[in-house]
C-alpha cells in the first residue's frame, strides 16, 4: 500500500492517495478474507444499517468504528483491496499477530516492503461486529502529516474491499452514507435505495479486488479504477501524452511509500465518459501511475482499453456516485 503526501490541486485542498500493489502472498490473504465467515453480529436487527460518514478536508469519507473496544476513525476506500490499521496504532488497539492455526500469512509484500498481518479480536462498525478480523498494518505517516497540515483528525486505518464486498455494502458518496448488511442470511437488495435519475455502470472486479469501469477520454476508450481514496480524478501521464492533451505545470508533487516523489500536472479534458455518463470540461490531475497500477494494465493489450487513471472522490461526489458492492454496480448522475 502506497500513500502520497498531500498535494493541493486547483481548489487548494489536499488529496492523499493510497496506491496498492499486492504480491501473491497478499492476494492469498484477500482470498482468505473473501472466503472466510464474517464473524459474529452485535444484533440481528436491523438487517441493514446506514452509517453516517464524515467528509474530511482531504475529501475522504470517514466512519466511526471500535477496535477491541477503542474508538477509531477509518477511511472507507474502494481502492483498497484489504483493510489496514496504522502501524503506530498497533499497540494502542492491542492487535495480535496471526497464528499457524489461522492459515493466514504472517506478512505480505506490498510494493517491495513487507507488512505484518495482525488480528483484531473485535472490529465493530455500527451494529456489525467482526470477530478475529485479519488486517494489515501499514505506515500511514503520509496521511498523518496531511491531516496535521489541514488541522484535522488523523485516521487510524482503512476499510477495504475485504469488508465491503462480504457485507454487500452500498457507499453513497454524495449523501455520505455507508449501508452495511448486518445479517449475511438476508437476501435481496438494500431497502429504500432510490435509483431514479441515476445511470448504472457495471463494475469489473479484478483478481486483486480493484474496481474498474469502462469509459473514455475525449472519445478514446479507457478504463478507470473507482477509488474513493483518491481526492480527485487522476489520469496516467503517459496516457495523456499519447492523447496529446495539453497540461500545465503545478508547484506540487506527490510522494508515496517505496516510490520516488512525482510531480503533479493538471489537464482540462473536453469529454470524460464513465459508462453512459458524459462529463464535459473536466479538470483532472495528471501523474505517473507506473508502479501503482500493475500487471500491464496501463498499456492497451489484446485490443482492450488501458487503465487510464483513477475515478476519484471529487467526481464521485459531484455526480451523486453510489457504489453497490453487492451488485457490483456504480450509479452516477
Language model regions located:
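Sequence-pattern detector for short linear motifs
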Residues: 8, 20-21, 92
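Residue-level detector of alpha-helical transmembrane segments in integral membrane proteins
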Residues: 1-3, 30, 39
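Pepsin/retropepsin-fold aspartyl endopeptidases
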Residues: 33-333
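Bacterial N-terminal signal peptides
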Residues: 21-32
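N-terminal secretory signal peptides that target proteins for export/translocation
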Residues: 1-17
Amino acid at each position: 500500500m502506497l500513500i502520497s503526501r498531500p498535494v493541493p490541486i486547483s481548489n487548494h485542498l489536499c488529496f492523499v492517495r493510497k496506491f496498492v500493489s499486492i504480491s501473491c502472498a497478499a492476494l492469498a490473504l484477500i482470498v482468505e478474507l473473501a472466503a472466510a465467515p464474517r464473524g459474529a453480529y452485535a444484533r440481528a436487527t436491523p438487517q441493514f444499517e446506514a452509517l453516517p460518514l464524515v467528509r474530511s478536508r482531504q475529501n475522504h469519507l470517514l466512519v466511526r468504528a471500535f477496535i477491541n473496544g477503542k474508538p477509531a476513525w477509518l477511511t472507507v476506500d474502494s481502492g483498497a483491496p484489504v483493510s489496514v490499521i496504522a502501524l503506530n496504532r498497533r499497540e494502542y488497539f492491542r492487535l495480535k499477530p496471526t497464528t499457524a492455526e489461522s492459515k493466514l500469512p504472517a506478512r505480505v509484500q506490498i510494493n517491495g516492503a513487507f507488512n505484518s498481518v495482525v488480528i483484531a479480536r473485535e472490529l465493530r462498525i455500527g451494529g456489525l461486529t467482526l470477530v478475529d478480523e485479519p488486517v494489515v498494518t501499514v505506515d500511514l505517516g503520509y496521511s498523518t502529516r496531511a491531516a496535521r497540515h489541514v488541522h484535522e483528525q488523523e485516521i487510524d486505518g482503512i476499510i477495504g474491499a475485504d469488508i465491503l464486498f462480504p457485507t454487500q455494502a452500498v457507499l453513497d458518496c454524495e449523501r455520505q452514507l455507508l449501508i452495511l448488511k448486518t445479517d449475511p442470511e438476508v437476501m435481496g437488495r438494500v431497502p429504500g435505495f432510490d435509483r431514479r435519475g441515476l445511470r448504472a455502470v457495471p463494475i469489473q472486479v479484478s483478481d486483486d479486488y480493484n474496481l474498474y469501469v469502462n469509459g473514455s477520454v475525449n472519445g478514446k476508450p479507457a478504463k478507470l479504477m473507482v477509488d474513493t481514496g483518491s481526492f480527485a480524478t487522476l489520469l496516467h501521464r503517459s496516457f495523456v501524452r499519447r492523447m496529446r492533451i495539453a497540461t500545465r505545470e503545478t508547484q506540487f508533487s506527490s510522494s508515496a511509500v517505496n516510490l520516488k516523489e512525482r510531480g503533479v500536472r493538471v489537464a482540462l479534458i473536453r469529454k470524460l465518459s464513465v459508462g453512459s455518463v458524459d462529463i464535459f470540461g473536466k479538470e483532472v490531475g495528471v501523474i505517473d501511475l507506473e508502479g501503482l497500477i500493475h500487471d500491464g494494465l496501463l498499456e492497451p493489450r489484446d485490443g482492450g482499453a488501458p487503465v487510464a487513471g483513477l475515478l476519484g472522490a471529487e467526481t464521485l461526489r459531484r455526480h451523486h456516485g453510489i457504489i453497490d458492492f453487492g451488485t457490483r454496480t456504480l450509479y452516477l448522475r
